[in-house]
Design a protein with these regions (language model features):
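Short helix/turn-capping signatures at newly exposed starts of structured segments
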Residues: 1-141, 152-154, 159-195
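Active-site beta-strand termini and strand-to-loop segments that position acidic
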Residues: 147-151
Length: 195
């Protein structure tokens, strides 16, 4: 299966028993968006993130320019990015989040789980074709696959129940996360009564 054919494995829209529609971003479109952000030459300023948004034809929220609506057809704000201080008044993009499935009413969420599972598998297969084998894990019910790119950008796709989403963490975000993990590991060692 390729990124172009993966979308045929599951329906992009499923009408649920209450009449609501569960939508899944077609794999080809989702993978193109993921790659646009993950393969960007980091660091990325907020202005560069907004320019990438415009190049992709996405629309900012009226209340928060860091939240977008894509043309992927799920009918809601489905993208956001976060920034961190990069020194002085300068900010840099630390992460990007893309929802690959729509929100649906709670009473019918279980109906979407099989479709979400097939979508997750199709996305993992398509991203594996691009980035090679990722690291699979499960934490607190969230099944995820993570790829660390040569740039130290991290791509993480996860699913829990009817939700499928992807996060792209910038190299600077990964460096901060490693530093925090090391700090907390050292604190734990210092506070270990067995030492």
């Amino acid at each position: 299966m390729t990124a172009d054919t993966a979308g045929t494995v599951f329906p992009a829209e499923t009408v649920l028993s209450d009449g609501s529609v569960y939508r899944v971003v077609p794999v080809g479109a989702g993978v193109r968006a993921i790659r646009a952000w993950a393969e960007y030459p980091w660091p990325m300023s907020p202005a560069q993130a907004l320019a990438l948004r415009d190049r992709l034809g996405w629309t900012s929220s009226l209340t928060n320019e860091r939240m977008f609506t894509t043309d992927h057809g799920i009918g809601e704000k489905d993208v956001s990015f976060n920034t961190i201080e990069a020194g002085g008044d300068t900010r840099t993009v630390s992460s990007f989040h893309l929802s690959l499935t729509s929100r649906i009413p709670k009473p019918v969420r279980a109906e979407a789980v099989p479709t979400a599972g097939r979508a997750f598998d199709a996305y993992v297969e398509a991203l594996t074709a691009v980035y090679g084998q990722g690291k699979r894990s499960r934490n607190r019910g969230v099944l995820s696959v993570t790829w660390t790119l040569p740039s130290d950008t991290l791509v993480d796709i996860g699913t829990v129940g009817r939700v499928v989403s992807v996060d792209v963490d910038s190299p600077v975000g990964n460096e901060i996360a490693r530093g925090e993990a090391q700090y907390f590991a050292e604190i734990a060692d210092e506070n270990d009564p067995a030492r």
